[in-house]
Every structure is written in structure tokens, then in C-alpha cells.
A protein has these predicted regions:
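Loop-rich catalytic cores of soluble enzymes, especially ATP-dependent carboxylate-amine ligases
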Residues: 119-137, 144, 152-183
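Histidine-centered active-site/metal-ligand motif
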Residues: 149
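Terminal catalytic/cofactor-binding subdomain
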Residues: 1-135, 142-146, 181
Length: 183
């Protein structure tokens, strides 16, 4: 089937595009009053970085990651993110701030970037070891670059319609895995 015909066929299933889910992951560095990366551990008021699904750490103790659950509208995502941002700012220690830029603040060197610690459980040790490996391979400074990640997932109805149109003989998760990147 030609591309134009495939696109035309998909318009019949456009209602499935309103059933998708989205979320955001937002990273920010905590900095001390002097503008350098915080040497303080992840604030206890944020909950455990290992088990709190919405407030965790990314690479280092100072790189806070806010994670929204998946929602079906951008308004809900932004409302949830705003509420979480309000919470972390309210509970941030008085001697710290959030660095507003994606490029890191003043970093005195690799030794001044405390790798995230997730505790003594097997899962926690694995997460910390993974970050130590990133530090060894790429350097810790590179890992302190903060960003915003937009997550988007298509509904099962969309995938079924798309699969029937594109490759009827390929099914299930295998099809989804093979075709996500093309969209």
C-alpha cells in the first residue's frame, strides 16, 4: 500500500489518537547558596529516592528528578508537575536553591559530585552501581546536565489499527517495539 493510501486509511482511526497517555520527567540540580552543586543528600522530606515514584534522583544526590504519572491530557500533566514542583520548592532546605539551567552550575570537579545513593537493598545497590559505571565511562560532570523528558504512549486501540494497516502478519508487543521509532 502506498504511503498516501496508508495515511488516508489511518484517518478513519483518528479517534484512537485521543486515548494516548503522556508524562514528563523534569530534572533540576540543587545548589548551595554559593552557586555550587549541593553536597547534601537527597532531602528526607522528599521521601526515598528509591521508592518515591514522583520525586527521585537521577545521576547524583543533587540532581532531583520529578516524574509525573501518565495522563490523558497535557493539562493534567502540567497540573501534577506544578503540584510536585510546589512541594519540592516548599520543602527545599533554606540554604539551597534549584539551578534554573540545563547546563550544570559551578562544579569544582568530579570528586564534588556525590553519586546518588539508594540504600543497601539489592535494587538500591544496582542503581548506585549503574551510576558509578556511568561516571567511570563518561565522567560525572557530563551526567549532571539536567533536562526535561516528554513521554508519550499510544493506546492499544491505535496500535491495533496501525498494525492491521501496516503489517497484518506481525502482532503484539513485537510489532509495537519494531514500529515505535518510525512514528
Amino acid at each position: 500500500m502506498e504511503l498516501e493510501a496508508k495515511i488516508q486509511s489511518l484517518t478513519a482511526t483518528k479517534h484512537t489518537l485521543f486515548q494516548n497517555l503522556m508524562g514528563i520527567e523534569k530534572e533540576s540540580l540543587r545548589v548551595s547558596d554559593d552557586g555550587s552543586i549541593s553536597q547534601e543528600p537527597h532531602p528526607k522530606t522528599y521521601g526515598s529516592a528509591l521508592t518515591n515514584p514522583q520525586i527521585t534522583t537521577d545521576f547524583c544526590e543533587a540532581l532531583v528528578e520529578l516524574v509525573t504519572p501518565p495522563f490523558d491530557s497535557a493539562d493534567k500533566v502540567l497540573e501534577d508537575l506544578g503540584n510536585t514542583e510546589h512541594f519540592v520548592h516548599y520543602h527545599l532546605p533554606d540554604n539551597q536553591r534549584y539551578w534554573p539551567a540545563s547546563m550544570p552550575c559551578v562544579v569544582r570537579g568530579e570528586a564534588y559530585i556525590p553519586i546518588a545513593q539508594y540504600g543497601s537493598s539489592n535494587r538500591g545497590k544496582m542503581k548506585t552501581a549503574y551510576r558509578q559505571g556511568l561516571s567511570n565511562r563518561y565522567g560525572s560532570v557530563m551526567q549532571t546536565i539536567a533536562g526535561i523528558h516528554f513521554n508519550y504512549s499510544f493506546s492499544e486501540d491505535f496500535w491495533q489499527a496501525y498494525q492491521e494497516l501496516m503489517v497484518p502478519e506481525e502482532t503484539g508487543q513485537c510489532f509495537i517495539d519494531n514500529h515505535y521509532i518510525y512514528l
